[in-house]
Regions:
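Alpha-helical interaction segments
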Residues: 18-19, 37, 55, 91, ...
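Thiamine diphosphate
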Residues: 1-5, 12, 66, 87-224
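Active-site diphosphate/adenylate-binding microenvironment
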Residues: 27-124
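General helical secondary-structure elements
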Residues: 14, 22, 48-50, 167
Length: 224
C-alpha cells in the first residue's frame, strides 16, 4: 500500500550517482578477488602460514575457485556445502538468472552439497550442474555415490576440496585454545576419486589450476 502512494519519480534524485557508486564498488571487489591468493592468519595463530610453507605445491581455495570459474558453462547450476572452502567460494560465481545457486544458508546442514546437486540435475536434466563440498562435509553424504552411478541417473559433476581437515572446526579450535586443535584432521591417504571409481563413476584427481579448469570443462561436456 505504501509503494502505491509513491510517485513515479520517487528515488530519482542522485539515482545515477548511486548506480555509478555501485558499479565502482563492485568493480573494486572483483579486482580484489583476482589478487587474493591466500587467507591471512587470525591474530595469535600461524595456521595458514604453516600450511603454505608445508604444502607450497597445493592450490589455495581462492586459486581453485578462479580455476573453477574459468571452466564453468554460462548456464550452469551449482550447489555448495558448509565449511570454509565453500564459504570462500560464495564470492566468486556470478549468475544472470535466478535459481542457479543452491546453498545451505544459515541452516548449516553438513552434507547438503552432494544430494542437492543430484536433485537439481534430475529437475533440469539438460542443464550442466556442479556440486561443491569440502572433504569433511562430503563424508556425510558420500554414500549417495552408490546410488547416483546407476545407469538411469543423469551424470553430474561433484568437486571435493581436499585439505584433509574439518577446517571450520579447526579454525574455531585454534582461535579459542591458543593455536591448539584436536579431532579435526582427516586421513590424507583416502582417495575420493578411487571411491567414485569403485561405485561406478569417474573419479579425477587434479593438483593445478590448469588441470582443474580442464576437468570442469570436460566433466560438464560429458553430462550431455
Amino acid at each position: 500500500q505504501l509503494l502505491n502512494k509513491l510517485s513515479s519519480k520517487a528515488g530519482d534524485i542522485d539515482r545515477q550517482k548511486r548506480k555509478d557508486l555501485i558499479h565502482k564498488t563492485k568493480s573494486a571487489w572483483l579486482q580484489m578477488l583476482t589478487s587474493l591468493d591466500h587467507e591471512e592468519d587470525d591474530p595469535g595463530t600461524v595456521w595458514n602460514k604453516e600450511a603454505r610453507k608445508r604444502d607450497s605445491d597445493r592450490m589455495s581455495p581462492r586459486k581453485a575457485w578462479r580455476a573453477i570459474q574459468a571452466g564453468m558453462p554460462e548456464d550452469v547450476i551449482i550447489s555448495s556445502d558448509i565449511g570454509n572452502n565453500c564459504a570462500i567460494g560464495n564470492a566468486y560465481p556470478t549468475f544472470e538468472k535466478g535459481r542457479k545457486y543452491l546453498a545451505p544458508g544459515l541452516f548449516g546442514p553438513c552434507g547438503y552439497g552432494f544430494p542437492s546437486i543430484l536433485g537439481a540435475k534430475i529437475g533440469c536434466p539438460s542443464t550442466p550442474v556442479i556440486g561443491f563440498a569440502g572433504d569433511g562435509a562430503f563424508g556425510i553424504s558420500m554414500n549417495e555415490m552408490s546410488s547416483c552411478a546407476r545407469k538411469e541417473w543423469p551424470a553430474i559433476t561433484m568437486v571435493i576440496f581436499r585439505n584433509y581437515q574439518w577446517g571450520a572446526e579447526k579454525r574455531n579450535s585454534i582461535l579459542w585454545f591458543d593455536d591448539n586443535f584436536v579431532g579435526t584432521e582427516l586421513d590424507p591417504e583416502l582417495s575420493y576419486a578411487k571411491i567414485a571409481e569403485a561405485c561406478g563413476s569417474k573419479g579425477v584427481l587434479v593438483k593445478t589450476q590448469v588441470e582443474l579448469t580442464e576437468a570442469i570443462k570436460v566433466s560438464c561436456e560429458e553430462q550431455q
